[in-house]
Amino acid sequence: MGYSYSEKKRIRKDFGKRPQVLNVPYLLTIQLDSFDKFIQKDPEGQQGLEAAFRSVFPIVSNNGYTELQYVDYRLEEPEFDVRECQIRGSTYAAGLRVKLRLVSYDKESSSRAVKDIKENEVYMGEIPLMTDNGTFVINGTERVIVSQLHRSPGVFFDSDKGKTHSSGKVLYNARIIPYRGSWLDFEFDPKDNLFARIDRRRKLPATIILRALGYTTEEILNLFFDKITFEIAGDKLLMTLVPERLRGETASFDIEANGKVYVERGRRITARHIKALEKDNISQVVVPSEYILGKVASKDYVDLESGEIICPANGEISLETLAKLAQAGYTTIETLFTNDLDYGPYISETLRVDPTYDKTSALYEIYRMMRPGEPPTPESSEALFNNLFFSAERYDLSTVGRMKFNRSLAFPEGEGAGILSNEDIIAVMRKLIDIRNGRGEVDDIDHLGNRRIRSVGEMAENQFRIGLVRVERAVKERLSLGDLDAITPQDLINPKPISAAVKEFFGSSQLSQFMDQNNPLSEVTHKRRISALGPGGLTRERAGFEVRDVHNTHYGRLCPIETPEGPNIGLINSLSAFARTNDYGFLETPYRKVVDGQVTEEIEYLSVIDEANYIIAQANSNLDENNRFTDAFVTARGERGESGLYKPEDIHYMDVSTQQVVSVAAALIPFLEHDDANRALMGANMQRQAVPTLRADKPLVGTGMEKPIALDSGVAVVAKRGGTVQYVDASRIVIKVNEDETIAGEAGIDIYNLIKYTRSNQNTCINQIPCVNLGDPINRGEVLADGPSTDLGELALGQNIRVAFMPWNGYNFEDSMLVSERVVQQDRFTTIHIQELSCVARDTKLGAEEITADIPNVGESALSKLDESGIVYVGAEVKGGDILVGKVTPKGETQLTPEEKLLRAIFGEKASDVKDSSLRVPNGTSGTVIDVQVFTRDGVEKDKRALEIEEMQLREAKKDLTEELEILEAGLFARVRNLLISSGADAAQLDKLDRTKWLEQTIADEEKQNQLEQLAEQYEELRKEFEHKLEVKRKKIIKGDDLAPGVLKVVKVYLAVKRQIQPGDKMAGRHGNKGVISKINPVEDMPYDENGQPVEIVLNPLGVPSRMNIGQILETHLGLAAKGIGDQINAMLKQKQEVEKLRSYIQKAYDLLGNGSQKVDLSTFTDEEVLRLAGNLRKGLPVATPVFDGADEAEIKELLKLGGLPTSGQITLYDGRTGEKFERPVTVGYMYMLKLNHLVDDKMHARSTGSYSLVTQQPLGGKAQFGGQRFGEMEVWALEAYGAAYTLQEMLTVKSDDVNGRTKMYKNIVSGNQHMEPGTPESFNVIMKEIRSLGLNIELDEE
């Protein structure tokens, strides 16, 4: 396998046995693709903005003489780029311009002649744009729109599982769910009548819906029942016989024909009887006249002479009616065929409870149910019913809904519209009745074929459509008002409702979330999150266990491991590593196609619906070199996702990868297969909380997923095109692009500006560090600079730490850990946190607030860190209470005391009419000011500091652009020089000339002269573009800022805090093994091995067996082996051994077992490359053990041997304090440890006095409110148990809510009088008031 220049720097040894058929797809596809579909023009108008416009336009006036037509739209370029929007606190968005056409028709003309057409472009608000990394910048903060898993539109058949009725009878129901519009439900009641509900309102007999569709009783019966025909022949009654219908019934008379008795009376009719009847072709039997009694007529029987109805349709036949029918001359009678077994009389029974008799009365009934209290008219009731299900404007099943509907009811694919038809409704009722009759079964709602993903684009489109519909109403009103001569489309459209709808969605929707930016993994997982909550989804309280459970259709689509603990468990999921959504929004996962027992390289994506009919083998099935299954029986998933053993020739597909089942976070856990699922869940979740350390350290034991996550997260800088590094410093990298990758006529220079020390959403530090050197050859897609938590383009969330599993004097009781002081000294877990504090100067009623260094009653020392504008210097070290920005607020006129008047008279007008409202550092925070930004409103004079910052920004912008220009010019002039020299010019002569003169030379060769002229033009273009860019930049910087109403100035101060690790901080491994640091121990007291090397962290071995996360032990062993090999390489480098020895040792390590997917051949490496590789392997050979396909025990032992270590993985340790040997060998190795964002500094908090709650007068709770500690019920019991009455009394009175008592107490303490007078706690008064509010008088009797 060929390695690029930077990949050769450090190669991870892969233990995977199976070749990688499919690389992990780009991880942010779900977000980017969805939004692209929303924004890009779709010529078919099926999706995105185009679909929204086409669904609302044209808007026709009520009189029909004018209409507003939609032509097309365009998005403008955003004013500021992403970075500028973040700094300014604005939204990264593009203006939407829509071309509309107002057409008015001639009222006089009969043939709709066009009278006038006006066309112009209308501004319709702003659409937030997605950044390259799948996020949105809204008001300066990065947000993510989480995809939603909701119930797919279509028809669903379900049952109440016997929970509704006390008898336990199972009631079936059907529900038609459109994409938008009214829901239609059908349900059985305990009496087996069929009812319908519209939008979950009051239920009506289902036949009312059929009558409203225009069906008569007779037609309704014809739709749902088979018939039995009776013939009256003299005094005999003959029945047409369909033998199959008799199965299971008991004969109430002898069934005989042609003198042969087939079934005797009272006998149950069996299959044998039916066979005999069918064999003899018996089509009619004589039945006693009692047999027809109680049967139901299928149509109206009318006495033709008198016109009297003898027996109505759905009426029962009695002896009397039978006689009347015979008398009226009817010889055949049709009745409905029903039985108790599988042909129930449900519709017939329902017609009996149906109060309506024709279409109008049915429509009235529906109108009364939908609009109670309004009198129905024929027109209004008809219009209401038609609008419910048969109007494309109000009702849409959508393509997905229609597809699901047709599949459920076995209609041909692709037929039917977005609205319902009569056939659709009847088919649903028929299927529901069939299910009640025992044919067919109900759907599984949690099946992923019944739930679909709704992503950003689709949700944004829905919001946009809501805004458009609001606009449509207003436009219709305007159009009908008349006087259209003076009106243009511009006047008709008010963009406010549209921008409000869009803004509300992006700003405050439940699914628009503040991006989790702790580290690259948390960003990627947040964007791949799938939530069942949100608008149109479930709610936490209502969701039961079934919805939250892992379903077998989740396989390869949703991760069974990664989900939050707590109330949202199972409702928020994560996309599996290879999953994607299809056009309908259903999740699909890739499989390798199997043909006749041979696995091909062909890959197909299948959704759950498609997958149902196939047998699919697992990814770890054994294959021979011809890709055929070696086992006689293969474990595979068959019907309904149940696994079983199948013959190789029966198998249709095979999984693509062993990591296919889990999400990216779970795929980062090595030896996941040896961890208990609950702990793996914690491990996957805690990796997202790891804080980026000062120096990222790649994991020694990884899974091979580290690289794709780091690259796809967008935190690292990746080369867009290949080339050579021409310039590199801490803040920018310049690449001279390879000739073959440049476009003709461009300079071929790529400039990458790096992000330096910026604050993330979680206050961690984002910083990019170059990892290439001058002159390095670079390929497209290679890493140029590492971001937070990345190391040479690999995800590096924590540090490799030498750990020992042993108890140590109780310091690792209950999951706590003992940490060596060396870890602190080496800054292994030191992190940088950046806080943003802002100070806002507003225009108040009493006058404007002012930012100034002249603050009343503040000493010189407090102002020492401020400049003359009253803003802190960059680089100042500040602590809690220090002033960062001086600000004064005008206060109202106050009555002056005579003394003040005197002082005023002597010293003149003192600035006493302002109060100090400066921005101070919050208590308990300290740090260094790393940046200050000043935003000034348009029209307000800028202060000195703002001008300095502006000047600095201009200088930097100019420097950036000048450098860019110089580099581009250098590239261009190099080409000019080559051209001139190739045409015979003298190089020495050329170099004496000014470069711009080169362009004025003439060349005899015409083609070369043309090239030179082209280059001269390009030079001119470059200069012009430089001037233009500089001017644009200058305008942006000088321009006043767009601040909120009433705000004059905003100053933002950024503080950086360096936090070392300390007792109380939370740490964790990757296997859910979390704990708190109990003590930082001196190095000399830590246990050490025979070489005198101390361990860095001591973990409790009791945390392993009960939690069943054995993966951590295997990781520790493999980590030890990897480090051992690193030590051997280090020793060889120190002894300066020849390269060949190094090469063969490293080759041996790579060739050792495993490596199914990757063979490393060091013979193709130059000596220099081998040495560079060895230098990077000094700290240990990084290994990858992919999930479910990792290293096994034998391989770990071999690797330990190669590293010259005991194969048990256990080492004799000595006590650092006494030097004595511990009783038995201890498991020592290297584990990857993370520092989580739960730092004791953020949690520690103390209060003496502070704010109190308004009603109860008790101290508030929580650090944010500077609250007290709650002395709760159980604590009270504890003091009661000790009999500490006085302590308890002060807890419940003066230390809590006895207002007078605590004031007196304070006075007493001040005056040195240690005395307490408790009174009545305020909460007693509150409870008395509450009881009185119930109308019960309650008083406290003073004794």
Swiss-Prot record:
Q: What are its GO biological-process terms?
A: DNA-templated transcription
List the GO cellular component terms.
DNA-directed RNA polymerase complex
Q: Give the record's keywords alphabetically.
A: DNA-directed RNA polymerase, Nucleotidyltransferase, Transcription, Transferase
Q: Which InterPro entries match?
A: DNA-dir_RNA_pol_bsu_ext_1_sf, DNA-dir_RNA_pol_bsu_external_1, DNA-dir_RNA_pol_su2, DNA-dir_RNAP_su2_dom, DNA-dir_RNAP_su2_hyb_sf, RNA_pol_bsu_bac, RNA_pol_bsu_CS, RNA_pol_bsu_protrusion
Cite the EC number. Answer: 2.7.7.6
**Entry-linked Gene3D superfamilies:** 2.40.50.100, 2.40.50.150, 3.90.1100.10, DNA-directed RNA polymerase, beta subunit, external 1 domain, DNA-directed RNA polymerase, subunit 2, domain 6, RNA polymerase alpha subunit dimerisation domain, RNA polymerase Rpb2, domain 2
Kind of enzyme, top EC level? transferase
PROSITE patterns noted in UniProt: RNA_POL_BETA (PS01166)
Reaction(s) catalysed by this chain's protein: RNA(n) + a ribonucleoside 5'-triphosphate = RNA(n+1) + diphosphate
MF terms in GO: DNA binding; DNA-directed RNA polymerase activity; ribonucleoside binding
| Subunit and partners | The RNAP catalytic core consists of 2 alpha, 1 beta, 1 beta' and 1 omega subunit. When a sigma factor is associated with the core the holoenzyme is formed, which can initiate transcription.
Question: What role is this protein assigned?
Answer: DNA-dependent RNA polymerase catalyzes the transcription of DNA into RNA using the four ribonucleoside triphosphates as substrates.
What is stated as this protein's family in its record? Belongs to the RNA polymerase beta chain family.
Q: What is the protein's name according to its record? A: DNA-directed RNA polymerase subunit beta
State the organism of origin. Answer: Haemophilus influenzae (strain ATCC 51907 / DSM 11121 / KW20 / Rd)
Q: Give the gene symbol.
A: rpoB
